[in-house]
Structures are given as structure tokens and as C-alpha cells.
């Protein structure tokens, strides 16, 4: 067998391997929990922040739903909504990057994988960014990096606490180095935010991996996570093959990282807003303390 044939066979093998994803909920009256199999009335599930009342499984939610759970009603004001990605490298693998962008934008109604803006939480002004995994796996490209950096700089200038809700597969490979450099750019802005003595809290949701984990997701004053969220850099299989040993079953979960000091606290989604408000008050962030 030639080397070319070997690679061709490998590609065929890899093409049938699918990443485990939560099934789409759809618009029906009932929803089945992928964790415990319980069938739940969809209206009740949504009323409970899309958390299974039987087993506590946190269903994946989109950026708009996340903002509605965190921000006081009517307080969120989006920033930089016009920013949209281009295709500077003319990248193409099985499909052209430009085609992927158009399709994803059409399917999600988003320009890119993060929404940023200012809001209030229990009356306290806060800068908020929410990544959306529906947009190319929440991957971090140049627009995601630029929007996050601008938000951090605004939070620093206005001395506002900052929350970034992370949900990402990592850097966007279709943008090459333009994607990777966002790690340093965002981290630099966060360092200036830290030097200003202002609170930054990342919330790690399922999944948070790759270059996002290796940069702004782990730079918080307080690192929060949702229960059982997948959090890591490289994939489990890659690590096992490198170390040549079996990893614990709960490896790369929020609970494992908390036990080993990488996560400060795990916050159930139904308690998130009150927890954020209490943490900000504890750090001296007062209601109406700054203009949003």
C-alpha cells in the first residue's frame, strides 16, 4: 500500500467518526433528556432554564437564551453587531470557508460566534459576552477575537465587571494565524483589565476546549463552570495516546477541574444570576454604580 492510499483510508475511517452532540430539541411539545431518558414537557424544561428536573442535565442553549437568563429584562445593549468575518486566506477543505460562513449565518441568524454588550444583573452594570456553539462550534476567529477585545477595553474604561460565557471548540482553523493571534490579543486586554482592579469572571459551559481554554477562559479572577461541562485543551484520546495510560472517567469535566484547583465554583444554571449578583456585590460592584 502506498503512503497516499494509507492516508486515503485514514480519511475514510475518520469521516465516519462523529462527535457526540446533543440532539436538536425541535419545536415539539415534549423533549427527551439525553442523560437520563426522561421525557419532559418542553414548556416546563424551558421554565427551568433548560435543566432537566429529573437528573439536572444542562441542555445546550443558544446565546439569546443565555442572555435572557443572565441580564435584567430589557437591559442588554449589544455592541459591534455589524462586525462580520471575511475569508482572507481563501480557505477551502471539503468546502469553501466562505460557503460555510454563509450557511451558518443563514441557519443561526448570527454574524459570528459571539454576542457582546452591556447589561445589568440585579441592577448592577456588567459587560457581557456570550459565545454560541451553533456558529461553527463556537470557534474563535478574528471577529470573535475583535469583539471580545473591544468589550474588555470598554469594561476597563468604564470600570465594569466582565462575564464571558465560553462555549467553543477552540481557534478557527480556517483563519490560520489570524485566529491564533486572538488568544494573545484578548489576553493582553484582560491583563489591562486586571491591572485596573476590575472583576473578570469566565463561565465555562459545555464544551470549552482548545485555544479558548488556553487563553481567556482560564484568566478569570473567579472561574465559574456549569455542572458536568467538558473543559480541556487537547482531546481525551490524544492525551491517552501521548501518556500511554487510561484517564479517569470524569477527566476534563467541571467537577474534575474543580477538585484539582482549575475551577473555583460550579454554578447550576438556575442559580447563575443570583450567584453573579452576589459575587459582584462582594467585590464592591454597586447597583447603578456606572452608566451602561
From Swiss-Prot:
Q: How is the cofactor bound?
A: Binds 1 zinc ion per subunit.
The enzyme's E.C. designation: 2.1.3.15
Name of the featured protein: Acetyl-coenzyme A carboxylase carboxyl transferase subunit beta
> PANTHER family, per this entry?
ACETYL-COENZYME A CARBOXYLASE CARBOXYL TRANSFERASE SUBUNIT BETA, CHLOROPLASTIC
* Gene Ontology molecular functions: acetyl-CoA carboxylase activity; ATP binding; carboxyl- or carbamoyltransferase activity; zinc ion binding
Q: Which cofactor does it need?
A: Zn(2+)
Matching entries from Pfam families are given as:
Carboxyl_trans, Zn_ribbon_ACC
Q: Pathway membership of this protein? A: Lipid metabolism; malonyl-CoA biosynthesis; malonyl-CoA from acetyl-CoA: step 1/1
Q: What's a GO biological-process term for it?
A: fatty acid biosynthetic process
Q: What is its main location?
A: cytoplasm
User: According to its UniProt entry, what is the function of this protein?
Assistant: Component of the acetyl coenzyme A carboxylase (ACC) complex. Biotin carboxylase (BC) catalyzes the carboxylation of biotin on its carrier protein (BCCP) and then the CO(2) group is transferred by the transcarboxylase to acetyl-CoA to form malonyl-CoA.
Subunit comment:
Acetyl-CoA carboxylase is a heterohexamer composed of biotin carboxyl carrier protein (AccB), biotin carboxylase (AccC) and two subunits each of ACCase subunit alpha (AccA) and ACCase subunit beta (AccD).
ZnF (C4-type) residues: 33-55
